């Protein structure tokens, strides 16, 4: 069999094998067999030395034409196989649109976040600004600027989380107030601010205590700010959060950064002030601490206490949420039980 006959036979055989290939792998095997470096066409070219000189050009031309034909059919066959594979995958992954859908569970706000957002809107409406500050604080701002001397019990290692000798996890958001007082320009008006955020204390976690909790503190500094201004503000807060029929009272207390200092109670939600287990038969429930800003605190911030005065208050957002929603265990706030959070969906905006 001469080379021309061999080329004719190879043409028919090769095209048939290309057509019969059922996968990209088998098609590639055919390609290697026909046009690879050691394939059939290459073997024919190696036999050119045995061809008469006058026919070598014609044989070479036939080989090139056949190689082009094979490559063209190989490319077309590969495209067809890819298309079939895509169609098969689409068929296998086809979605039955008549099947019922899966319900998406919509998230809800955390109860503490609900309380915080509500109070922020309330105070912003009264002209307050919301100010944030660092959670890792220096002793200077966390204690000294707030009239807490070196020997104060709150500065003890057993009560506070120290990061190093001079820095700690803030034990209240009051340092934000100290930083803000230092920078405030009273020529532009009184300072009215709230500072919400996380605070940290060395408490053993139980149903009513947590080593980390949420606090919101408020501060007003200006000329002729009085205890009656504080009383009126706190009454508005209590009625806003706990109901317009809620009665309030102020009791004398002690805080190093205020003088005089008071604690505010509200009439019991359960018994209306008659006395029950919730209010320990007193008819009242403690909700926050407050007072007139101590002159030493004003002086530390560079404010003349003979010209300016102010009031401050601090409330636990966790405690407000516990009281408002009747939650028994503070640890529920920090659990990962979605069912607990879903109870408060109706309380959202």
From Swiss-Prot:
Cofactor, free-text remark: Binds 2 magnesium ions per tetramer.
Top-level taxonomic group: Bacteria
Top-tier EC class: ligase
Residues that, per the record, bind Mg(2+): 259
CC terms in the record's Gene Ontology section: cytoplasm
The keyword Signal is annotated on this UniProt entry: no
Family from the record: Belongs to the class-II aminoacyl-tRNA synthetase family. Phe-tRNA synthetase alpha subunit type 1 subfamily.
Descriptive protein name: Phenylalanine--tRNA ligase alpha subunit
Organism: Lactobacillus delbrueckii subsp. bulgaricus (strain ATCC 11842 / DSM 20081 / BCRC 10696 / JCM 1002 / NBRC 13953 / NCIMB 11778 / NCTC 12712 / WDCM 00102 / Lb 14)
Gene coding for it: pheS
């Amino acid at each position: 069999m001469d080379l021309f006959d061999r080329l004719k036979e190879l043409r028919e055989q090769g095209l048939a094998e290309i057509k019969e290939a059922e996968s990209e792998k088998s098609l590639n095997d055919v390609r290697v067999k026909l046009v690879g470096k050691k394939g059939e066409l290459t073997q024919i070219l190696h036999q050119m030395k045995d061809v008469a000189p006058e026919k070598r050009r014609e044989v070479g031309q036939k080989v090139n034409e056949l190689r082009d034909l094979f490559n063209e059919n190989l490319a077309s066959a590969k495209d067809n196989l890819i298309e079939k594979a895509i169609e098969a995958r689409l068929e296998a992954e086809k979605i039955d649109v008549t099947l019922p859908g899966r319900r998406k569970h919509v998230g809800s706000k955390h109860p503490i976040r609900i309380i915080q957002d509500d109070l922020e809107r309330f105070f912003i409406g009264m002209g307050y600004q919301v100010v944030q500050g660092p959670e890792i604080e220096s002793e200077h701002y966390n204690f000294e600027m707030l009239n807490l001397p070196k020997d104060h019990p709150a500065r003890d290692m057993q009560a506070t989380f120290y990061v190093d000798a001079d820095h700690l996890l803030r034990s209240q958001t009051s340092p934000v107030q100290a930083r803000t007082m230092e920078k405030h320009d009273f020529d532009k008006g009184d300072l009215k601010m709230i500072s919400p955020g996380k605070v940290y204390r060395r408490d053993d976690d139980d149903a009513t205590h947590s080593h980390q909790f949420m606090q919101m503190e408020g501060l007003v500094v200006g000329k002729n700010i009085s205890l009656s201004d504080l009383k009126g503000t706190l009454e508005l807060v209590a009625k806003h959060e706990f109901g317009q029929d809620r009665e309030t009272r102020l009791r004398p207390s002690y805080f190093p950064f205020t003088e005089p200092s008071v604690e505010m109670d509200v009439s019991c939600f359960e018994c209306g002030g008659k006395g029950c287990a919730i209010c320990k038969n007193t008819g009242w429930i403690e909700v926050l601490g407050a007072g007139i800003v101590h002159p030493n605190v004003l002086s530390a911030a560079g404010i003349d206490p003979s010209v300016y005065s102010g009031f401050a208050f601090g409330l636990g957002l966790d405690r407000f949420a516990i009281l408002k929603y009747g939650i028994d265990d503070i640890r529920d706030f920090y659990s990962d039980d979605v069912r607990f959070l879903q109870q408060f969906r109706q309380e959202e905006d």
